Amino acid sequence: MHTPVNYITTWFYKESKEEASFYPQLGQKGSSSLVHSIYMQIQVPFFVTFKHYNPDAQFIFFTNLNQKELPDYLIRLFHKLNVEVVTLPYTCKPPKDWYPAWQNQFYLYDILKYMDDRMQENDTLLISDADCLCRTPLNTLFDAVRKDGSALYEFITDRVYSINGITLPQMEEVYQSCYGKEAASSITYYGGEFVALRKDIISKINIAYPQLWAFNLEYVKQHPFKLNEEAHILSLLAEHLNIRNKTANRYVKRMWTTPHFNNVQPGDENYPVWHSPYEKKRGLYYLYRLIGEKSEITNEADFWEKAGKYTGIPHISLKKKVKDRLTTLWMKFK
């Protein structure tokens, strides 16, 4: 009898100069050496924290790079933590100049195609962005996915806000045009940074995705808006396949810690998973340096005290503000 497997995965797609899109949080295009080095470094705190609290899960790192192209410290880490590296081509790539930013994001659907062939009944898959830290075991998350089929992160419900070039009412127009019916309830935006799915739901997504994507390519020829990124697609597929929920909201929060916008509140430090997009070249870099060659958490209380100070969760200290500024300047001239 097959014992169900919980897969925890993240990914990095290295863009070429010809296809490079803009990464707003890093202020660089995806082909830059800075972007590459930062994304390699943040794999360390990601895998160390997720593995520490979920030792029985199977871990995979997806990339278009060959393993020999990874930095030595990452190869050593993956060997120690038993992280599998899967080199996967990008076949779901959008057309050139599709949207100015984040054109690597449709790699998610290549991962789903790969995992569909690999997973068995009742296996579950978590695809997480690498700028996340795990604080607790995720057994209850996987149990919920095994029961309900999915755990999605509902991030935006504002019907006026333009979400990377499209509003929720406009997404509903695309949905109605594609499927010939209105959504059963108002469309909401599900973030692509934390998506957990059961094997059979992955199969359904892989069947439904080509139709929606082909429709999207034709739709933009006659309309001023389109589904620009992977989460737009996911949000419509969730409605179409009746897998909508906000289960993942109990586990993760996208925590903005910029000088201009901060949505972190006291108590947010208790989330099982911290998503810290602004901290890629700041707090997560400091954690990469802290972990070093140890590749493990030896003192949980000490580690999370430092992690909170480094990432500004739940409070940003004056010391962090100064250190962040100096680190940013140093990286500019690195």
Show where each model-derived region lies.
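Short, surface-exposed amphipathic charged segments that create phosphate/polyanion-binding patches used
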Residues: 97-107, 166-170, 263-267
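Short acidic donor-binding/metal-coordinating loop in glycosyltransferase active sites
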Residues: 130-132
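Long, low-complexity C-terminal extensions of enzymes
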Residues: 259-334
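Conserved donor-nucleotide/metal-binding helix-loop-beta segment in metal-dependent transferases, i.e.
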Residues: 134-171
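N-terminal anchoring/stem segment of glycosyltransferases
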Residues: 1-96, 120-121, 312-334
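A conserved donor-nucleotide-binding helix/loop in the catalytic core
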Residues: 37-46, 93-126, 136, 140
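A short acidic (Asp/Glu
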Residues: 20, 70-74, 136-139, 235-236, ...
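Catalytic core and acceptor-binding pocket of nucleotide-sugar-dependent glycosyltransferases
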Residues: 178-281
